[in-house]
Protein backbone atom coordinates (compact mmCIF):
# COMPACT_ATOMS: atom_id res chain seq x y z
CA UNK A 1 0.00 0.00 0.00
CA UNK A 2 1.44 3.35 -1.05
CA UNK A 3 2.03 6.12 1.46
CA UNK A 4 -0.62 8.86 1.67
CA UNK A 5 0.40 12.11 -0.01
CA UNK A 6 -0.01 15.70 1.10
CA UNK A 7 0.68 18.76 -1.04
CA UNK A 8 1.65 21.75 1.10
CA UNK A 9 1.25 25.19 -0.45
CA UNK A 10 3.14 28.09 1.08
CA UNK A 11 5.54 30.71 -0.11
CA UNK A 12 6.94 34.19 -0.15
CA UNK A 13 7.97 34.64 3.48
CA UNK A 14 9.40 32.57 6.28
CA UNK A 15 6.24 33.23 8.28
CA UNK A 16 4.33 30.99 5.87
CA UNK A 17 7.11 28.54 5.04
CA UNK A 18 8.57 27.65 8.45
CA UNK A 19 5.30 26.51 10.06
CA UNK A 20 4.57 24.51 6.91
CA UNK A 21 7.92 22.78 7.26
CA UNK A 22 7.11 21.95 10.89
CA UNK A 23 3.87 20.24 9.84
CA UNK A 24 5.69 18.48 7.00
CA UNK A 25 8.17 17.00 9.45
CA UNK A 26 5.38 15.63 11.67
CA UNK A 27 3.62 14.02 8.71
CA UNK A 28 6.82 12.50 7.33
CA UNK A 29 7.43 10.91 10.74
CA UNK A 30 3.95 9.41 10.42
CA UNK A 31 4.80 7.87 7.04
CA UNK A 32 3.35 10.49 4.71
CA UNK A 33 4.81 11.49 1.36
CA UNK A 34 5.16 15.28 1.39
CA UNK A 35 5.34 17.51 -1.68
CA UNK A 36 5.44 21.32 -1.76
CA UNK A 37 3.79 23.63 -4.27
CA UNK A 38 5.80 26.84 -4.55
CA UNK A 39 7.73 29.31 -6.64
CA UNK A 40 11.32 28.08 -7.08
CA UNK A 41 12.47 31.69 -7.53
CA UNK A 42 11.19 32.74 -4.09
CA UNK A 43 12.18 31.90 -0.52
CA UNK A 44 10.57 28.46 -0.63
CA UNK A 45 12.99 27.56 -3.42
CA UNK A 46 15.87 28.07 -0.98
CA UNK A 47 14.31 26.60 2.17
CA UNK A 48 12.26 23.59 1.08
CA UNK A 49 14.50 21.35 -1.09
CA UNK A 50 17.34 21.22 1.50
CA UNK A 51 14.82 19.60 3.88
CA UNK A 52 14.46 16.70 1.46
CA UNK A 53 11.02 17.81 0.25
CA UNK A 54 10.31 17.95 -3.48
CA UNK A 55 9.33 21.43 -4.65
CA UNK A 56 6.60 21.29 -7.28
CA UNK A 57 7.06 24.50 -9.30
CA UNK A 58 4.30 27.05 -9.71
CA UNK A 59 5.27 30.60 -10.61
CA UNK A 60 2.76 33.12 -9.32
CA UNK A 61 3.08 36.22 -7.18
CA UNK A 62 0.77 38.87 -5.85
CA UNK A 63 0.10 42.24 -7.44
CA UNK A 64 -1.02 44.11 -4.35
CA UNK A 65 0.85 47.41 -4.13
CA UNK A 66 2.56 46.90 -7.51
CA UNK A 67 0.57 49.51 -9.42
CA UNK A 68 -2.11 49.57 -12.10
CA UNK A 69 -0.04 47.81 -14.76
CA UNK A 70 0.46 44.76 -12.56
CA UNK A 71 -3.24 44.74 -11.68
CA UNK A 72 -4.17 44.64 -15.37
CA UNK A 73 -1.99 41.56 -15.82
CA UNK A 74 -3.60 39.73 -12.91
CA UNK A 75 -6.34 37.85 -14.85
CA UNK A 76 -3.80 36.45 -17.30
CA UNK A 77 -1.28 35.55 -14.59
CA UNK A 78 -3.95 33.93 -12.42
CA UNK A 79 -5.39 31.91 -15.31
CA UNK A 80 -1.93 30.63 -16.21
CA UNK A 81 -1.17 29.75 -12.58
CA UNK A 82 -4.50 27.93 -12.20
CA UNK A 83 -3.78 25.89 -15.33
CA UNK A 84 -0.37 24.97 -13.93
CA UNK A 85 -1.90 24.05 -10.58
CA UNK A 86 -4.55 21.86 -12.23
CA UNK A 87 -1.85 19.90 -14.09
CA UNK A 88 0.27 19.53 -10.95
CA UNK A 89 -2.69 18.22 -8.95
CA UNK A 90 -3.66 15.83 -11.74
CA UNK A 91 -0.14 14.41 -11.77
CA UNK A 92 0.27 14.16 -7.99
CA UNK A 93 -3.28 13.24 -6.93
CA UNK A 94 -2.69 14.18 -3.28
CA UNK A 95 -4.91 12.82 -0.54
CA UNK A 96 -5.11 16.28 1.03
CA UNK A 97 -3.85 19.80 0.28
CA UNK A 98 -2.68 22.15 3.04
CA UNK A 99 -2.56 25.89 2.32
CA UNK A 100 -0.32 27.83 4.70
CA UNK A 101 -0.59 31.22 3.01
CA UNK A 102 1.20 33.25 0.39
CA UNK A 103 -0.06 34.07 -3.08
CA UNK A 104 1.13 30.76 -4.53
CA UNK A 105 -1.43 28.99 -2.34
CA UNK A 106 -4.39 30.66 -4.04
CA UNK A 107 -4.41 28.98 -7.48
CA UNK A 108 -3.45 25.66 -5.93
CA UNK A 109 -6.25 25.88 -3.38
CA UNK A 110 -8.89 26.85 -5.92
CA UNK A 111 -7.92 24.00 -8.21
CA UNK A 112 -7.87 21.55 -5.30
CA UNK A 113 -11.44 22.53 -4.45
CA UNK A 114 -12.54 22.16 -8.08
CA UNK A 115 -10.98 18.69 -8.17
CA UNK A 116 -12.73 17.84 -4.88
CA UNK A 117 -9.43 17.22 -3.17
CA UNK A 118 -9.73 17.94 0.57
CA UNK A 119 -8.36 21.42 1.28
CA UNK A 120 -7.18 22.53 4.73
CA UNK A 121 -6.22 26.17 5.26
CA UNK A 122 -4.06 27.54 8.08
CA UNK A 123 -3.68 31.29 8.72
CA UNK A 124 -0.76 32.30 10.91
CA UNK A 125 -1.57 35.98 11.48
CA UNK A 126 -4.32 37.59 13.54
CA UNK A 127 -5.53 39.26 10.32
CA UNK A 128 -6.04 36.82 7.46
CA UNK A 129 -4.07 37.28 4.26
CA UNK A 130 -5.75 37.77 0.89
CA UNK A 131 -5.23 34.20 -0.33
CA UNK A 132 -6.50 32.58 2.85
CA UNK A 133 -9.56 34.84 3.09
CA UNK A 134 -10.73 33.45 -0.25
CA UNK A 135 -9.57 29.88 0.26
CA UNK A 136 -11.31 29.65 3.64
CA UNK A 137 -14.62 29.66 1.76
CA UNK A 138 -13.58 26.55 -0.16
CA UNK A 139 -11.74 24.63 2.54
CA UNK A 140 -12.96 21.53 4.39
CA UNK A 141 -11.25 22.77 7.57
CA UNK A 142 -10.08 26.28 8.48
CA UNK A 143 -7.30 26.63 11.07
CA UNK A 144 -5.59 29.66 12.57
CA UNK A 145 -2.77 30.65 14.85
CA UNK A 146 -4.92 33.09 16.83
CA UNK A 147 -8.61 33.09 17.82
CA UNK A 148 -11.35 34.76 15.79
CA UNK A 149 -9.40 35.22 12.56
CA UNK A 150 -11.66 33.50 10.01
CA UNK A 151 -15.23 32.17 9.93
CA UNK A 152 -15.28 28.48 10.92
CA UNK A 153 -11.73 28.94 12.14
CA UNK A 154 -10.23 26.59 14.72
CA UNK A 155 -7.44 28.27 16.70
CA UNK A 156 -4.83 25.51 16.95
CA UNK A 157 -1.84 27.85 17.20
CA UNK A 158 1.28 28.28 15.10
CA UNK A 159 3.93 25.55 14.95
CA UNK A 160 7.04 26.63 16.87
CA UNK A 161 10.40 25.01 17.51
CA UNK A 162 10.49 22.28 20.13
CA UNK A 163 13.50 23.80 21.90
CA UNK A 164 11.44 26.88 22.80
CA UNK A 165 8.60 24.78 24.20
CA UNK A 166 11.08 22.75 26.25
CA UNK A 167 12.49 25.74 28.15
CA UNK A 168 11.95 25.73 31.94
CA UNK A 169 9.12 27.81 33.36
CA UNK A 170 9.87 31.55 33.74
CA UNK A 171 9.81 31.32 37.55
CA UNK A 172 12.59 28.74 37.42
CA UNK A 173 14.64 30.69 34.88
CA UNK A 174 14.35 34.04 36.66
CA UNK A 175 15.10 32.58 40.10
CA UNK A 176 18.37 33.75 41.56
CA UNK A 177 19.01 36.45 38.98
CA UNK A 178 20.39 39.73 40.21
CA UNK A 179 22.07 42.83 38.89
CA UNK A 180 21.28 44.61 35.63
CA UNK A 181 18.33 43.48 33.57
CA UNK A 182 19.15 41.38 30.52
CA UNK A 183 17.57 42.70 27.33
CA UNK A 184 17.50 40.88 24.00
CA UNK A 185 16.75 43.03 20.95
CA UNK A 186 15.83 41.26 17.71
CA UNK A 187 15.38 43.61 14.79
CA UNK A 188 14.59 41.00 12.18
CA UNK A 189 15.16 41.36 8.46
CA UNK A 190 12.34 43.84 7.81
CA UNK A 191 12.33 47.36 9.17
CA UNK A 192 15.09 46.86 11.71
CA UNK A 193 16.29 50.45 11.37
CA UNK A 194 13.90 51.86 13.98
CA UNK A 195 15.05 49.46 16.70
CA UNK A 196 18.68 49.70 15.66
CA UNK A 197 18.71 53.47 16.10
CA UNK A 198 16.25 54.00 18.95
CA UNK A 199 17.57 51.41 21.42
CA UNK A 200 21.17 52.73 21.56
CA UNK A 201 19.92 56.31 21.93
CA UNK A 202 17.51 55.29 24.70
CA UNK A 203 20.20 53.45 26.66
CA UNK A 204 22.46 56.49 26.43
CA UNK A 205 19.80 58.50 28.29
CA UNK A 206 19.92 56.13 31.27
CA UNK A 207 22.55 56.48 34.00
CA UNK A 208 25.31 53.98 33.33
CA UNK A 209 24.55 52.02 36.50
CA UNK A 210 20.88 51.72 35.46
CA UNK A 211 21.52 50.40 31.96
CA UNK A 212 20.56 46.81 31.18
CA UNK A 213 22.89 44.27 29.62
CA UNK A 214 21.99 44.15 25.94
CA UNK A 215 22.32 41.50 23.25
CA UNK A 216 21.21 43.04 19.95
CA UNK A 217 20.71 40.99 16.77
CA UNK A 218 20.33 42.97 13.58
CA UNK A 219 21.29 40.80 10.61
CA UNK A 220 24.58 40.84 8.75
CA UNK A 221 23.60 43.75 6.51
CA UNK A 222 22.83 46.05 9.45
CA UNK A 223 25.60 44.99 11.84
CA UNK A 224 28.23 47.67 11.00
CA UNK A 225 25.69 50.50 11.35
CA UNK A 226 24.42 49.02 14.63
CA UNK A 227 27.90 48.80 16.09
CA UNK A 228 28.51 52.41 15.06
CA UNK A 229 25.23 53.51 16.67
CA UNK A 230 26.21 51.99 20.02
CA UNK A 231 29.72 53.43 19.79
CA UNK A 232 28.38 56.92 19.09
CA UNK A 233 25.96 56.57 22.00
CA UNK A 234 28.77 55.51 24.32
CA UNK A 235 26.89 52.34 25.26
CA UNK A 236 28.30 48.83 25.53
CA UNK A 237 26.27 46.08 23.88
CA UNK A 238 26.78 42.60 22.46
CA UNK A 239 25.94 43.23 18.79
CA UNK A 240 25.43 40.18 16.60
CA UNK A 241 24.56 39.55 12.99
CA UNK A 242 22.77 36.32 13.88
CA UNK A 243 21.86 34.32 16.96
CA UNK A 244 22.41 30.63 16.36
CA UNK A 245 20.60 29.43 19.49
CA UNK A 246 17.56 31.66 19.85
CA UNK A 247 16.02 29.42 22.51
CA UNK A 248 19.02 29.91 24.77
CA UNK A 249 19.06 33.65 24.06
CA UNK A 250 15.40 33.92 25.05
CA UNK A 251 15.98 31.79 28.13
CA UNK A 252 18.75 34.11 29.31
CA UNK A 253 16.79 37.33 28.66
CA UNK A 254 14.60 39.16 31.14
CA UNK A 255 13.04 41.17 28.32
CA UNK A 256 12.76 40.83 24.55
CA UNK A 257 12.28 43.87 22.29
CA UNK A 258 11.14 42.79 18.84
CA UNK A 259 8.70 43.03 15.94
CA UNK A 260 5.37 41.20 16.06
CA UNK A 261 5.25 38.71 13.23
CA UNK A 262 2.91 35.80 13.84
CA UNK A 263 5.73 33.35 14.47
CA UNK A 264 7.55 35.78 16.76
CA UNK A 265 4.47 36.27 18.94
CA UNK A 266 3.87 32.53 19.06
CA UNK A 267 7.52 31.92 19.98
CA UNK A 268 7.33 34.50 22.78
CA UNK A 269 4.40 32.59 24.26
CA UNK A 270 6.08 29.22 23.75
CA UNK A 271 9.28 30.36 25.45
CA UNK A 272 7.54 32.33 28.19
CA UNK A 273 9.51 35.55 27.88
CA UNK A 274 8.45 39.13 28.62
CA UNK A 275 8.31 41.11 25.37
CA UNK A 276 7.91 44.67 24.18
CA UNK A 277 6.43 44.41 20.70
CA UNK A 278 7.07 47.21 18.20
CA UNK A 279 4.96 46.18 15.19
CA UNK A 280 6.34 46.83 11.71
CA UNK A 281 4.11 49.75 10.66
CA UNK A 282 4.06 48.90 6.95
CA UNK A 283 2.87 45.30 7.31
CA UNK A 284 -0.14 44.52 5.12
CA UNK A 285 -3.40 45.30 6.96
CA UNK A 286 -1.27 46.23 10.01
CA UNK A 287 -1.43 42.56 10.94
CA UNK A 288 1.56 42.80 13.29
CA UNK A 289 -0.36 45.09 15.63
CA UNK A 290 -3.21 42.57 15.71
CA UNK A 291 -0.71 39.77 16.40
CA UNK A 292 0.84 41.67 19.30
CA UNK A 293 -2.54 42.38 20.86
CA UNK A 294 -3.10 38.65 21.35
CA UNK A 295 -0.64 38.89 24.24
CA UNK A 296 -0.72 42.58 25.15
CA UNK A 297 -4.50 42.56 25.69
CA UNK A 298 -3.95 39.77 28.23
CA UNK A 299 -1.24 41.73 30.07
CA UNK A 300 1.18 39.09 28.77
CA UNK A 301 3.32 41.54 26.76
CA UNK A 302 3.63 45.24 25.97
CA UNK A 303 2.83 46.90 22.65
CA UNK A 304 4.31 50.21 21.49
CA UNK A 305 3.66 51.64 18.00
CA UNK A 306 6.82 52.58 16.14
CA UNK A 307 5.52 56.12 15.61
CA UNK A 308 5.72 56.78 19.35
CA UNK A 309 8.85 54.75 20.06
CA UNK A 310 11.19 57.61 20.90
CA UNK A 311 14.49 57.31 22.78
CA UNK A 312 12.99 59.37 25.61
CA UNK A 313 9.93 57.12 25.92
CA UNK A 314 11.96 53.92 25.78
CA UNK A 315 14.51 55.15 28.33
CA UNK A 316 11.76 56.07 30.79
CA UNK A 317 9.90 52.80 30.17
CA UNK A 318 13.01 50.66 30.67
CA UNK A 319 13.87 52.55 33.84
CA UNK A 320 10.50 51.61 35.33
CA UNK A 321 10.76 47.85 34.71
CA UNK A 322 11.68 45.41 37.46
CA UNK A 323 12.75 41.80 37.14
CA UNK A 324 9.80 40.73 39.31
CA UNK A 325 7.34 42.40 36.94
CA UNK A 326 9.03 40.92 33.88
CA UNK A 327 8.87 37.45 35.39
CA UNK A 328 5.13 37.84 35.99
CA UNK A 329 4.54 38.96 32.40
CA UNK A 330 6.66 36.09 31.09
CA UNK A 331 4.58 33.66 33.12
CA UNK A 332 1.35 35.03 31.69
CA UNK A 333 2.76 34.75 28.17
CA UNK A 334 3.57 31.07 28.75
CA UNK A 335 -0.07 30.34 29.60
CA UNK A 336 -1.00 31.31 26.02
CA UNK A 337 1.40 28.82 24.41
CA UNK A 338 0.07 26.07 22.15
CA UNK A 339 3.12 23.81 21.92
CA UNK A 340 1.49 20.96 19.96
CA UNK A 341 0.22 23.08 17.08
CA UNK A 342 2.16 21.21 14.39
CA UNK A 343 0.85 17.83 15.59
CA UNK A 344 -2.73 19.12 15.79
CA UNK A 345 -2.57 20.57 12.26
CA UNK A 346 -1.21 17.24 11.03
CA UNK A 347 -4.10 15.48 12.80
CA UNK A 348 -6.61 17.65 10.93
CA UNK A 349 -4.95 16.88 7.59
CA UNK A 350 -5.14 13.15 8.30
CA UNK A 351 -8.80 13.44 9.31
CA UNK A 352 -9.65 15.34 6.12
CA UNK A 353 -7.93 12.71 3.99
CA UNK A 354 -9.70 9.81 5.76
CA UNK A 355 -13.13 11.36 5.36
CA UNK A 356 -12.57 11.80 1.63
CA UNK A 357 -11.41 8.22 1.07
UniProtKB/Swiss-Prot annotation:
Q: Does the keyword rRNA-binding apply?
A: no
What are the BP-aspect GO terms? Answer: carbohydrate metabolic process; cell division; cell wall organization; lipid glycosylation; peptidoglycan biosynthetic process; regulation of cell shape
Specify one Pfam family: Glyco_transf_28
GO CC annotation: plasma membrane
SUPFAM superfamilies attached to this UniProt entry:
UDP-Glycosyltransferase/glycogen phosphorylase (SSF53756)
Reactions it catalyzes: di-trans,octa-cis-undecaprenyl diphospho-N-acetyl-alpha-D-muramoyl-L-alanyl-D-glutamyl-meso-2,6-diaminopimeloyl-D-alanyl-D-alanine + UDP-N-acetyl-alpha-D-glucosamine = di-trans,octa-cis-undecaprenyl diphospho-[N-acetyl-alpha-D-glucosaminyl-(1->4)]-N-acetyl-alpha-D-muramoyl-L-alanyl-D-glutamyl-meso-2,6-diaminopimeloyl-D-alanyl-D-alanine + UDP + H(+)
Which pathway does this polypeptide act in?
Answer: Cell wall biogenesis; peptidoglycan biosynthesis
Query: How is the protein disposed in the membrane?
Result: Peripheral membrane protein
Q: Where, by residue number, does UDP-N-acetyl-alpha-D-glucosamine bind?
A: 13-15, 125, 161, 189, 243, 288
GO terms (molecular function) for this protein are: UDP-N-acetyl-D-glucosamine:N-acetylmuramoyl-L-alanyl-D-glutamyl-meso-2,6-diaminopimelyl-D-alanyl-D-alanine-diphosphoundecaprenol 4-beta-N-acetylglucosaminlytransferase activity; undecaprenyldiphospho-muramoylpentapeptide beta-N-acetylglucosaminyltransferase activity
Report the main location listed first in the record: membrane
What are the alphabetically sorted keywords of the record? Answer: Cell cycle, Cell division, Cell inner membrane, Cell membrane, Cell shape, Cell wall biogenesis/degradation, Glycosyltransferase, Membrane, Peptidoglycan synthesis, Transferase
Q: Which InterPro entries match?
A: GlcNAc_MurG, Glyco_trans_28_C, GlycoTrans_28_N
Compartments reported by the entry: Cell inner membrane
Q: Give EC number(s), comma-separated.
A: 2.4.1.227
Q: What does this protein do?
A: Cell wall formation. Catalyzes the transfer of a GlcNAc subunit on undecaprenyl-pyrophosphoryl-MurNAc-pentapeptide (lipid intermediate I) to form undecaprenyl-pyrophosphoryl-MurNAc-(pentapeptide)GlcNAc (lipid intermediate II).
| PANTHER family in the record | GLYCOSYLTRANSFERASE, UDP-N-ACETYLGLUCOSAMINE--N-ACETYLMURAMYL-(PENTAPEPTIDE) PYROPHOSPHORYL-UNDECAPRENOL N-ACETYLGLUCOSAMINE TRANSFERASE 1
Q: Which family does it belong to?
A: Belongs to the glycosyltransferase 28 family. MurG subfamily.
Q: Which NCBIfam families match?
A: murG
Q: What is this protein's name?
A: UDP-N-acetylglucosamine--N-acetylmuramyl-(pentapeptide) pyrophosphoryl-undecaprenol N-acetylglucosamine transferase
Q: Which organism is it from?
A: Bordetella pertussis (strain Tohama I / ATCC BAA-589 / NCTC 13251)
Query: Which classification does the entry list for the species?
Result: Bacteria, Pseudomonadati, Pseudomonadota, Betaproteobacteria, Burkholderiales
Provide the gene name from the record.
murG
Amino acid sequence: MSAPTILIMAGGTGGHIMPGLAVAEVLRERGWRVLWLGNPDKMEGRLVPPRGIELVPLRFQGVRGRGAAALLKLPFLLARACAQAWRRLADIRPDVVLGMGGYVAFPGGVMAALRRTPLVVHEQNAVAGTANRWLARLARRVLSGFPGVLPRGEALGNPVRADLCALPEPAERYAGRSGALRVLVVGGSLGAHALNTTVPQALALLPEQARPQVVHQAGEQHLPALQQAYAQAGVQADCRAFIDDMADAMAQADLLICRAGAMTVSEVAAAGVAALFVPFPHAIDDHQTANARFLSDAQAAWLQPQASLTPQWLAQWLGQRTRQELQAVAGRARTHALPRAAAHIADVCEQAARRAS
